[in-house]
């Protein structure tokens, strides 16, 4: 892994463990969106698992931190602190990477909704909301469709969780792609890293602090969390004396653990704290973790347990199609649940089948979606990361 970094020091950098982090975070989101209850109370022994699954927002935070980190990497490693190529070329690259799979997944959801609508109009079929509970709803308005097509559905509470609820984060990330080069990078170049983090959090907190929750559905504080990813890249690769000293002096692994604990504690609803607080602590935890793991790789140290897990070929393979998994798992889980709901299953069996069957089918569908709807739009660099090559590499290593 270290050889990859050294060999490509002036070229495009790829840290495989980032794919592992992205993949495991996406898998956790899938598990969070499983609805294991048949409508009544879950058996007591399932409650612990349900509680473990209450931190889905932390996975979304990891995506935002990763986005800031990956976009900032070439800037932090450059000599002039600018993006490679023009602003238009940058947008074209980002659009090609995320928009085609997004729109294909959206059209599939609209098609499913149209089928349900026709069945309800011309047959005795009626969509059972209890059986179809989860991260997809076939009933939505034209406003929902238009806002999703324009990637602005996250800006209003009435649209951001319609159609395919996880998609609201895609809109937030897409909007951040514009803010990054037009606002964040100029601030960073003029006033430095600390200034861009403080200003971004200030901008992000204004809507929820002074406008009665205006734009709260977009989680505007994610702008500040995005800059935490930028900070991780800058600290990790900057040649500035002050940042090098910070990278080499702070206990990043311990800080990641501390901030994780603070994120979990401040998430407790009974404390009455706004969610931006626990999500910001989670963002700090992920940023510190990334600095810690990257530093460990570059210094050829014994890989810590977290790095071993994130660099495992299965985690990396999962990360390869994690975007497809994120886009498609909502409808898949809902239809698996719909089918299981009418089977003569006990609450225990229903919960177990919801997790096992729902997750398995979500992975299968996501992989095929990746092959036909995501991979064709990837850059040649990303296309080289084939899942079978990762797994073959694991087998040859063991042998």
Q: PLM features: residue spans?
A:
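Central hydrophobic cores of alpha-helical transmembrane segments
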Residues: 195-204, 256-259
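Residues within membrane-spanning alpha-helices of integral membrane proteins
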Residues: 19, 23-26, 67, 99-106, ...
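Alpha-helical transmembrane segments and their helix-entry boundary regions
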Residues: 18, 90, 98, 169, ...
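Membrane-interfacial loop-to-helix junctions in multi-pass inner-membrane proteins
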Residues: 12-15, 82-103, 122-136, 176
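Membrane-interface helix-loop-helix regions
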Residues: 102-170, 205, 282-295
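Alpha-helical transmembrane segments in multi-pass integral membrane proteins
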Residues: 2-17, 27, 31-56, 72-87, ...
């Amino acid at each position: 892994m270290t050889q990859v970094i050294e060999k490509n020091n002036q070229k495009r950098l790829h840290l495989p463990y980032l794919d592992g982090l992205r993949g495991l975070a996406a898998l956790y989101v899938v598990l969070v969106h499983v609805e294991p209850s048949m409508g009544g109370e879950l058996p007591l022994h399932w409650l612990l698992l349900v509680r473990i699954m209450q931190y889905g927002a932390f996975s979304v935070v990891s995506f935002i931190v990763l986005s800031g980190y990956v976009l900032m990497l070439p800037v932090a490693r450059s000599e002039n602190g600018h993006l490679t190529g023009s602003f238009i070329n940058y947008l074209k690259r980002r659009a090609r990477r995320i928009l085609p799979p997004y729109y294909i997944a959206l059209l599939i959801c609209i098609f499913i909704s149209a089928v349900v609508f026709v069945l309800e109009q011309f047959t005795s079929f009626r969509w059972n909301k209890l059986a179809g509970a989860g991260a997809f709803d076939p009933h939505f308005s034209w406003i929902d469709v238009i806002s999703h097509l324009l990637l602005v559905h996250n800006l209003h509470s009435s649209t951001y969780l319609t159609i395919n609820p996880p998609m609201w984060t895609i809109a937030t990330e897409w909007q951040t792609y514009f803010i990054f080069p037009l606002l964040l990078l100029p601030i960073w170049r003029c006033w430095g890293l600390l200034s861009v983090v403080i200003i971004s959090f200030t901008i992000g907190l204004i809507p929820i602090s002074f406008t009665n929750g205006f734009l709260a559905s977009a989680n505007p504080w994610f702008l500040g969390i995005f800059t935490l990813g930028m900070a991780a890249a800058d600290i990790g690769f900057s040649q500035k004396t002050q940042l090098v000293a910070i990278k080499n002096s702070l206990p990043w692994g311990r800080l990641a653990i501390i901030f994780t604990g603070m994120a979990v504690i401040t998430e407790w609803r009974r404390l009455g704290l706004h969610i931006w607080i626990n999500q910001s602590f989670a963002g700090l935890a992920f940023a510190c973790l990334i600095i810690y793991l990257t530093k460990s790789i570059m210094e050829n140290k014994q890989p810590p347990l977290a790095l071993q897990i994130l660099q495992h070929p299965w985690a990396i393979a999962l990360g390869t199609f994690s975007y497809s998994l994120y886009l498609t798992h909502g409808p898949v889980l809902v239809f698996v649940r719909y089918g299981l709901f009418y089977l003569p299953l006990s609450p225990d069996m229903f919960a177990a089948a919801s997790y096992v069957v729902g997750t398995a089918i979500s992975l299968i569908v996501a992989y095929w979606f990746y092959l036909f709807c995501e991979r064709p739009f990837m850059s040649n660099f990303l296309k080289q990361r084939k899942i079978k090559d990762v797994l073959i590499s694991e087998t040859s290593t063991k042998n």
